[in-house]
């Protein structure tokens, strides 16, 4: 099993270019000069991931007003992300990382505890990246329920 190196506030956010739900490439560099919430989740259309995505959807207006963009990343293929996006009415980008390279670079893939066992998988994580590409918030092992509300409080949104 692989232990991950976790990112911390002040670190430069690892660059990425990944396909979105429509197969178009999206890069972290596309958000240069803007703040962006990057969140990693295990699988589209599962109960916890759906709850988390819908919480981001329902709070997107407030995040946008506060100058924050939202991007979700999972190992799902673009086709599955498109189905998930359309079913849930998600309007922010969902990106596909099937090789888990970006997940690993951000410390969001590796050993985790699940039902009392150590397993290898996606570590539900959320980051806020500032206008200069630096991480200002790094949260690992977040809970799907209540996480977005906590993030709003932490960011005073």
UniProtKB/Swiss-Prot annotation:
CDD domains xref list: PRX_BCP
Gene3D superfamilies per record: Glutaredoxin
SUPFAM superfamilies documented for this protein: Thioredoxin-like
Listed GO biological process terms: cell redox homeostasis; cellular response to oxidative stress
Alphabetized UniProt keyword annotations: Antioxidant, Disulfide bond, Isopeptide bond, Oxidoreductase, Peroxidase, Redox-active center, Ubl conjugation
Lineage top rank: taxon: Bacteria
The UniProt record lists the keyword Ubl conjugation: yes
NCBIfam families: PRK09437.1 (NF006960)
Note: The active site is a conserved redox-active cysteine residue, the peroxidatic cysteine (C(P)), which makes the nucleophilic attack on the peroxide substrate. The peroxide oxidizes the C(P)-SH to cysteine sulfenic acid (C(P)-SOH), which then reacts with another cysteine residue, the resolving cysteine (C(R)), to form a disulfide bridge. The disulfide is subsequently reduced by an appropriate electron donor to complete the catalytic cycle. In this atypical 2-Cys peroxiredoxin, C(R) is present in the same subunit to form an intramolecular disulfide.
Protein name according to UniProt: Putative peroxiredoxin Rv2521
Lineage: Bacteria, Bacillati, Actinomycetota, Actinomycetes, Mycobacteriales
Gene: bcp
